[in-house]
């Protein structure tokens, strides 16, 4: 059994499609959009379908912006093993994007979490190259905002390649729901003690002085969790002062057990150092940095 700890910077897995026509389950909404304003994350959710065919779609966001994590849950959702590839598409105008799927349960209901940071529109080839180029030692690559017009044009979501059927959800225009999600995220930033207007107009975001994956090694895998075969996904954020020093680490969401959370924050506070964020005037200011750590066991 091999152990690995990976920092989730991008999902690049590709799976081949099947030539056989696939069943498509097309579901209309059966509830309104609801935003859950939690202390360390924001979640936008809506139910689709009725009875045993009902599924609930969640957009989880841990910082303001265009990125979110998708989760879909329902009695008829197939349980997923491992970390298989999936495809996610917001139609009718946007191209499909690739994501890594992880099986989960919410209130004993099967669920799938899509890792890798989803957007309404996937990154272009040029944007992906720029992101890879900056990932090692440069400032974070910031693609152009998608904007409300493209979000409004997205009226359905297709999830494919991961179940024995494809799931087509009539979301309706996504501009207003995602705007509500971002409102929650900015309020969350305010609750961290940061100046929201200042954070909205930074000339540079905080970023690590060395590749963040170097903060972790296989030896950091909790021994008890290794023996029990436990794995985890840990979303965290770090407050960074004007000198680039981390001042607080907070777990935003985690699939637990808690031993994984403790390893993440202990390593961050001990090993992480950052280039500080810069205000609109170019002055170093307090800010935050966030990421996801995956603890995986490879058989």
Residues covered by each model-derived region:
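An ectodomain-focused feature that recognizes extracytoplasmic/extracellular
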Residues: 20-86
